[in-house]
């Protein structure tokens, strides 16, 4: 799936927007207790090393609940693991682009 997405992006770059660029790959719905989650992280990092954000968004019930209440995770529960993960991602992106 990820390979197809990258091919689609290359096609869009070629035909419509040569300046289109990928900021990075974000791993989401991660659960460290699941072998599959760990295998996916390893495979993605192995194939797309420098493109993968260090921050991983962990599976979290608060992340699932927030959209049901029409709120961002920060507004819904800023102390949740999901909110912390997204704040860490924001910091990582800012540092990367300075």
Describe the function of each predicted region.
Residues 53, 58-71, 96:
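Repeat-unit-sized solenoid/scaffold elements
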Residues 88-97:
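C-terminal alpha-helix
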Residues 1-61:
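Conserved catalytic-core segment of NTP-binding enzymes
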Residues 66-88:
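C-terminal boundary of histidine-terminating zinc-finger modules
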């Amino acid at each position: 799936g990820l390979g197809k997405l990258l091919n689609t992006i290359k096609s869009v770059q070629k035909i419509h927007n040569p300046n289109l660029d990928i900021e990075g790959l974000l791993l989401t719905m991660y659960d460290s207790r699941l072998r599959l989650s760990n295998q996916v992280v390893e495979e993605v990092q192995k194939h797309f090393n420098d493109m993968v954000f260090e921050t991983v968004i962990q599976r979290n019930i608060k992340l699932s609940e927030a959209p049901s209440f029409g709120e961002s995770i920060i507004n819904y529960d800023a102390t949740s693991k999901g909110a912390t993960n997204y704040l860490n991602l924001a910091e990582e992106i800012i540092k990367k682009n300075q």
